[in-house]
Amino acid sequence: MRVVIGADKEGMELKNMIKCYLLENNFEVIDKSEEASEDFVESTVAITKDVLENKGSLGIAFDGYGAGSFMVATKIKGIIAAEVSDERSAYMTREHNNSSIITIGSKIVGSELALNIVKEFLEASYDGGRHQIRVDMLNKMA
């Protein structure tokens, strides 16, 4: 699976920890911020563009609180994103909402929780069915 990641200065340490996990577990990792982006807007826009251009890719944006990257991602047409700080939400946003990007705040979750969030997000798959109506509504909005 192809996973696109990126971070601003506040999310860099957590991003690098998750990157190591992804590489160790044979994910294809595209790091859009080998060096920290000056602002979460830059890193999140880079992630969203890549995810849109590469069907089937998933993205993870890291910043201080997750909210900034979330706001940016949801402004991009074709992107469904969720700010998550727990494992269940990470899983369900893929399964029911077909989210292609999650945002994680490094000042909100620690490294162990972040790792579990990423695992759940990447293990989940979209159910479709009755949830497609919601996804279609979201895609019409942005």
UniProtKB/Swiss-Prot annotation:
Q: Which UniProt keywords apply?
A: Isomerase, Lactose metabolism
GO MF annotation, one: ribose-5-phosphate isomerase activity
Q: Which InterPro entries match?
A: LacA (IPR004783), RpiB_LacA_LacB (IPR003500), RpiB_LacA_LacB_sf (IPR036569)
Q: Which GO terms describe its biological process?
A: D-allose catabolic process; galactose catabolic process; lactose catabolic process via tagatose-6-phosphate; pentose-phosphate shunt, non-oxidative branch
EC number assigned by the record: 5.3.1.26
Top-level enzyme category: isomerase
Which pathway? Carbohydrate metabolism; D-galactose 6-phosphate degradation; D-tagatose 6-phosphate from D-galactose 6-phosphate: step 1/1
Q: Which Pfam families match?
A: LacAB_rpiB
Catalyses which reaction? aldehydo-D-galactose 6-phosphate = keto-D-tagatose 6-phosphate
Q: Could you describe the subunit structure of this protein?
A: Heteromultimeric protein consisting of LacA and LacB.
Q: Which family does it belong to?
A: Belongs to the LacAB/RpiB family.
Q: What is this protein called?
A: Galactose-6-phosphate isomerase subunit LacA
